[in-house]
Amino acid sequence: MTQTAQDLLGQDWDAIIIGTGMGGGTIGRVLAENGFRVLFVEKGPKGHRSERQALHSEVFTPEARQLRGFWPDPVKATVDGRTAEFFAPIGAGVGGSSAFYAATLERPERHDIDVHPSATWPIGYDDLAPHYAAAEEMFHVCGADDPLSPEPQPKLRQAPPLDPSDASLKVEFESSGLHPYRLHSAIRYVEGCHGCLGSKCPKTCKMDGRSAGVEPALATGNAELVTECDVLALEGSADAITGLRVLHMGKTRHISAKRVILAGGALGSARLLLASQSDAWPEGAANSSGLVGRNLMFHLNEMFALWPKRKVAGDGASKAISLRDLYHPRDGSRFGTVQSMGIGAGYGEILHYLRLMLARSALAKLPLVQDLARIPAALAVKMLGNAKVFVGLLEDIGYPENRVVFDPDRPASLNIEYTLHPELRRRRGAFRKAIRRAFKSHRKLFLSMQPELNFGHPCGTARFGSDPATSVLDVNCKAHDLENLWVVDSSFMPSSFGVNPSLTIAANALRVGAHLSKEWRHDAE
């Protein structure tokens, strides 16, 4: 007998998981496979398995965005005192933002965790290493060894051969003294694979929170899913969650919760905790430290076009090459990886990029500003020709004043305040110089003049640690203040690394899931 959403919301569950992305989907699968009854609640729609739409900022109405699995409302960001509203690359559907991600799953460096100069991790790299390996297996990660890594190389699946143009470019880099390798990617490359970088995958080919997490969890028979269920607030006593206030099918209802695992993303989870103000939690849930929402980090994108020395026929742009030559220079600077973007320097790609830049700029409110982007886009295509687009990911550092802010007048909106600190601007300048030196034998052109925050990589807004005064979560990502709340998205991270956070989110979710499975089984005996 098929159960309705109302039936499911009224049942008792071992855990309710809010969010179905890299963190929520992964931990839900672990718990379900260990025999625990799990309910996923997802703000967005279930969608159709055959969908292949990309996450476009050109869809403006909330209803149309929600239907496509996009976060429905614009983010309000005040950066260096200037406020703009724009649609960030955030998903709201089964799989969350990971349904649209480019499937890059790379490990950080040991020094990112063990000896970071400005952030303390309560666990070491060796504590995460087996969970990185398990996540790489779960997400079918393929790629090649990083020739610069002193660590034991991960056992990855073999990736398909490089496109001839990428293979030629890789040789050019090696001849220049660089150390390129095949980027680590969570794509199975099944027959008819389109890569689906930046778009939903209609096959179980691109492995994300949906395909590697939620769907296998549902297949166990121990998990269920309720979509279009927006959690408005957590409810409870001073030391425990007792339930959730949700909006489902246009009606507000209260559901009881034995245990809650929050995985709504670093922006969404912080917003929900801050929105859960009550007599028991005057500053929001799990916020006795006052740190919920603070220490927000992104990455800075340094996008540049690079012209191969030789024009080699190929299948077009691919996200296949990564380099770590600039990750951690000898002078101690903290930079990051350089990767191919998986996009060509074509009109559509450049127009999309320019429109994103304009939406975040002071020109955003000018009439027809989006149409004005067509002119420089057309000129750029003629100028760039056969160039390939690369991006350098520059590590961000957490500062308390960089934060998610709750607006009671717009309780569902994502609001951030962010200041680019002088040290970040200095590191950005040094990073750009390092890129110029590293690729000095190639013609290149930076595609942005102003610092560009990567709003798809937020993290750090509920960092974990051993001291309740300086962290929100304990070593196992349980809220210090509450006995039955865990947070397993990128909120937990004390530092942002120089790589995409997705693999670390999944590995940490596996770590926490294994701990909870053991603990809950012991409690039941």
Model-derived regions, located:
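N-terminal glycine-rich phosphate/pyrophosphate-binding loop and immediately adjacent elements
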Residues: 2-126, 268, 285-308, 317-320, ...
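Glycine-rich loop(s) and the adjacent beta-strand/alpha-helix scaffold that form part
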Residues: 33, 40, 44-54, 229, ...
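Short, glycine/acidic-rich hinge or "gate" loops at secondary-structure transitions
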Residues: 50, 143-153, 446-451, 522-525
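Conserved redox-cofactor binding core of oxidoreductases
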Residues: 66, 77-78, 117-231, 463
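FAD cofactor-binding and catalytic pocket of flavoenzymes
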Residues: 75-88, 97, 101, 121, ...
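A non-catalytic, amphipathic alpha-helix used as a structural packing/dimerization or gating element
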Residues: 123-134, 426, 430-434, 511
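A glycine-rich dinucleotide-binding beta-alpha-beta segment and adjacent secondary-structure elements
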Residues: 183-199, 232-237, 386-394, 412-496
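A conserved FAD-binding loop/helix module that cradles the flavin
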Residues: 494-516
